[in-house]
Structure formats: structure tokens, C-alpha cells
Curated annotation (Swiss-Prot):
Protein family per UniProt: Belongs to the adenylate kinase family.
CC per GO annotation: cytoplasm
Subunit structure: Monomer.
Protein name as catalogued: Adenylate kinase
Recorded domain comment: Consists of three domains, a large central CORE domain and two small peripheral domains, NMPbind and LID, which undergo movements during catalysis. The LID domain closes over the site of phosphoryl transfer upon ATP binding. Assembling and dissambling the active center during each catalytic cycle provides an effective means to prevent ATP hydrolysis.
Binding residue positions for AMP: T31, R36, K57, L58, V59, G85, F86, P87, R88, Q92, R156, R167
Organism the protein comes from: Hamiltonella defensa subsp. Acyrthosiphon pisum (strain 5AT)
Amino acid sequence: MRIILLGAPGAGKGTQAQFIMKKYGIVQISTGDMLRAAVKAGTKLGQQVQGIMAAGKLVTDDLVIALVKERIRQEDCKEGFLLDGFPRTIPQADAMAEADIKIDYVLELVVPDEFIVERISGRRVHMPSGRIYHLKFNPPKITDKDDMTGESLTLRKDDQETTVRERLLEYHQQTMALVDYYRQRAKRGDTKYFKLDGTRTVNEVSQQLSSILGES
């Protein structure tokens, strides 16, 4: 089972990726982790990546595709994999198709922007302990104070509304065309595309996934 999981930051991809991995026994392939692992392993491709990154340049699509091909040949990918963070663009998706990397399912978690903004910008964190609160869904007993220590809570920069909206804009600019690309491929029978309602509870989304992917 080879899966691409699409969704905006804050749509719940991480939670559902863990569910898929556990239920179906497949591994998650993150391009960031893959690049770091290749450099650490010192493979020929890894040495190329290290040189490019050391020069402050972006790793080319061709090189990332070569790394993906190398990664999916490994034993732990025998039952399948879940691609995280790749492809992001149509040229990357085309390069995957040209490299004969077949994808069984493209799953898109859809959540309205305002829902995501509320979900993320409402977070407050007690930095020393890592405890996370939410102004609406899990508020502290005293506003902006940690329940255990009474210390101040922090709104992280990544959780600020302006930052969230910038990330959402970038996501939509990159991904709208990619979603249409995979819808067209699904119509041709090259893959299967499904859109899921990410505003539902975690369990409800997981149930949607189970009905699509089948029981393990």
C-alpha cells in the first residue's frame, strides 16, 4: 500500500499518519528525515546531498527522486509506505511517475482555513514542561497561566495567526494544482483519490480512512 497524504498545516495529517502506519504496518517516508539519513549513512547520493546542502543550495527534484527510489527498496518498505512532504509540486509528481514510483492512494484531508486558524492560534504552551492548552478546546483554569505551576503560558511564533495564514497561503498556492493533478490521474485509473473531512473528530477521520483503505 503506497500512500500520499495531503493536507494543510494543522489539518491533522500527523495524527492520521500515525494511525495508518500502526494499522497497516507501513512506514512513513519524510523527505527531511530521508535527506538527513542519506547524509549520515554516507552513501553516494548522501555525499551529493551533503555537498549541495553545505553550499546552501536546494536539493534538486532528480536527486530527491533518486533518494526516494533508494529508500523504498529497503526491507521496511516491503509492505508499503506513506509519503510525507513529497511531492509538493507537479514537476515533482511528474518525476515520480517517470521514475515508475506507483501510488495506490492519494488522500486529502480538507479543513477550512478559519477552522485551522482557530485550532492553531488558540494554542498556549507552558514552555518549561511542554504542556499545551487551547483557549477554546482545553483552556487553563486561570487565563494564560499553567494549571500546575501558575507560570505564564506562551503563544509560540509558529502558532501566531499571521504565521498560520502565511503557511496556509503557501500551501494552497503549491497544492491546489497538485490535487487537480492527482484527481486527473485517478480518473485515468493510475491511482485512487479520496477527499476526507478533516473537521471531524480524530476517531471519525480514522474510521473514514479504514473504510477507504480496508481493514488490516
